[in-house]
């Protein structure tokens, strides 16, 4: 189902500068701004409180990367591998993840606003305790993702795989899941109140009631 929510897009300069040494920019200056980074592997980048503003990452592989408390603004990740990256306790605003791998990525305890995940492989992604507002998750695989105690406000799940995902203590009120695969989703009955599901999904969710339908 198409989203009725307006998600702001990242804002960039018309021309972005190529990065000479991303480690110097982030580790020594704690800031990366108005840059484009392409076709690189970034190894073992660990920093806390980094600001990344108005940047584009294309075809980047992040290995052993931890940027907790990151301030991520007006940035696009395209065809990147962010598997197991740690962006926990960060602020993620006007950011796009396009055709990215997010296997086991940590975005827990984040403030996530005006963000689009499109065609991403995000099995085991962790979004626990985050606040998500004006977010689109479009044609993504978030199998066995963890959404524990997440505050969802105007979050659109479209044609995405949520098989065996964990939504403990996360209200799904007004959340439309009709185009998604939610088989085996782990959620409390009280948090399903107001959720929008199709008839087949509703039948599957009766397992939470411990009843038998003949």
Q: What is the predicted function of each stretch?
A:
Residues 3-214:
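Tandem repeat scaffolds
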């Amino acid at each position: 189902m198409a989203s009725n929510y307006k998600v702001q897009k990242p804002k960039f300069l018309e021309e972005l500068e190529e990065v000479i040494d991303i480690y110097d920019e982030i580790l020594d200056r704690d800031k990366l701004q108005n840059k484009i980074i392409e076709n690189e592997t970034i190894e073992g980048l660990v920093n806390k409180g980094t600001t990344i503003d108005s940047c584009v990452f294309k075809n980047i592989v992040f290995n052993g990367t931890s940027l907790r408390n990151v301030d991520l603004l007006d940035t696009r990740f395209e065809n990147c591998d962010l598997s197991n990256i740690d962006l926990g306790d960060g602020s993620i605003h006007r950011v796009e993840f396009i055709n990215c791998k997010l296997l086991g990525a940590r975005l827990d305890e984040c403030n996530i606003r005006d963000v689009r995940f499109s065609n991403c492989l995000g099995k085991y992604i962790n979004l626990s305790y985050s606040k998500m507002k004006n977010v689109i998750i479009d044609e993504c695989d978030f199998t066995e993702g963890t959404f524990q105690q997440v505050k969802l406000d105007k979050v659109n799940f479209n044609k995405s795989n949520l098989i065996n995902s964990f939504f403990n203590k996360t209200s799904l009120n007004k959340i439309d899941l009709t185009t998604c695969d939610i088989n085996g989703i782990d959620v409390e009955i009280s948090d399903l109140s107001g959720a929008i599901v199709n008839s087949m999904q509703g039948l599957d969710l009766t397992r939470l009631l411990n009843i038998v339908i003949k």
